Amino acid sequence: MKRPFMILALLLCLPAFAEPQSDSGPAADILAVRNIEITFHTAGSVLPSKDLDLMMSLYADDAVLTDTAHDNKVYRGKEQVRTYWVDVSGPFRPEHHWIGYTPAMRIKSHVTGNSATLYFECLWMDVDSNAIGAHAFTSMDLARVDGHWLVKRVKVGKVDKL
């Protein structure tokens, strides 16, 4: 009689073991990679002030950005990536007074040696209207260069549902 209950209990627990982990890799590297998301949102947020140079400090000189919200337009090299942030992206537009935030369940990072991936969704909150200005995703491929993590490739775009 105990055996069917044990099997049932085991079956009920299996989904918990099957769910993918949000992070994988050495803890110190995960922390460093996740700090990129913090720097990203600090740079694009109006409080204390928007900081394009801080945003660009995240990117390698040969970084490639793909804007999935605009027909997969590609920006190659750090100067073109800067152009994207100045001319296309919402956070750096002068009329937008946004604060960026990523809910904990919407960030994932994986580190293997000197390579990493980082995915997060951004809720850009408009401080003037107290409403969501944009809901976007960022998917990055990172490389450790001289001890620092830099963005090599990134895809950005809109998220349709919260």
Regions found by a protein language model. Name each.
Residues 64, 80-130:
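Surface-exposed, charged secondary-structure patches
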Residues 59, 69, 120-124, 140, ...:
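A mature extracytoplasmic/lumenal domain signature
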